[in-house]
Regions:
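Active-site proximal beta-strand in glycosyltransferases
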Residues: 89-91, 104-122
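Carbohydrate-associated surface elements
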Residues: 154, 176
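Membrane-proximal helix-turn-helix segments that form the acceptor-binding/catalytic region
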Residues: 78-82, 106, 130-148
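Conserved donor-binding/catalytic core segment of Leloir-type glycosyltransferases
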Residues: 187-204, 210-214, 227-228
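Short N-terminal targeting/anchoring amphipathic segment
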Residues: 78-97
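A short, histidine- and acid-enriched strand-loop-helix "catalytic/donor-clamping" loop
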Residues: 64-66, 98-99, 114-131, 144
């Protein structure tokens, strides 16, 4: 990313504005200092110290958007778009940004869509007392967007049910890559391999794949088989 690229909802500013009302009214130069890459890297290294309670409360503050303690961060995003020029259409990388998306849709008068990608896992990781409220807030804000884009019909149907969304709100577009400029390898390996390209975590089934690979190797019928993973 460009060094001049603005940072929105920087972790330090979000935490301070969530915890202390004083930081909801600080001048821009202070916010910019807290958004320095050096400080954010330091904070990221200590992210494991955030308690489940803090995570739940900050999630609710973020989802509340303009109606919560992080309204200053929402306005920063809106101001940036007004200064740079409104896009013809806006795609949110995740529907968890719907609280911001609904504001941009209303104030910029543009269509806004959100991608569905693993929000169920995040919601399930919250403590029960925060999970219910977070789901309600998300359901309300996502319904105000022009629609959602799911990587599969299964996940689209799952999230539509969880967030009480109309089926017409969900569009399906499978993940993939453009292969037009990719040429076949000239030197094809003589031994076969299993490939995995996704997030390296049990939620994606990587542990099951590894167990299956071990069983294949132990069978004695696939001595030359290798497992190649990336993500």
């Amino acid at each position: 990313a460009s060094p001049d690229q603005p940072i929105f909802f920087g972790g330090i500013n979000v935490y301070l504005q969530h915890k202390f009302s004083l930081f909801r009214h600080t001048p821009k130069w202070i916010d910019k200092a807290f958004d320095s890459k050096w400080l954010l890297r330091k904070a990221a290294a200590r992210s494991g110290m955030t308690s489940s309670k803090d995570l739940g409360e900050i999630t609710l503050s973020t989802f509340r958007g303009e109606d919560g303690p992080l309204v200053k961060e929402v306005n920063k995003v809106l101001t940036w778009f007004k200064e740079q020029g409104s896009p013809d259409i806006l795609f949110l990388s995740t529907i968890m940004l719907a609280g911001i998306g609904k504001v941009l849709k209303r104030e910029l008068n543009i269509p806004v869509y959100g991608f569905l990608q693993g929000e169920d896992s995040f919601l399930d990781s919250l403590l029960p007392e925060y999970r219910v409220e977070a789901s309600k807030l998300l359901s309300h804000d996502v319904a105000l967007l022009d629609g959602c884009i799911a990587p599969s019909k299964y996940f689209g149907d799952l999230m539509a049910e969880r967030l009480s969304l109309k089926p017409s709100k969900i569009k399906h577009h499978p993940n993939g890559i453009t292969t037009e400029r990719i040429l076949p390898a000239e030197d094809v390996p003589s031994s076969p391999s299993l490939g995995y390209l996704a997030r390296l975590c049990p939620l994606k089934g990587l542990d099951i794949l590894v167990d299956a690979f071990i069983e294949l190797k132990d069978s004695g019928n696939h001595d030359n088989l290798s497992l190649k993973i990336a993500g």
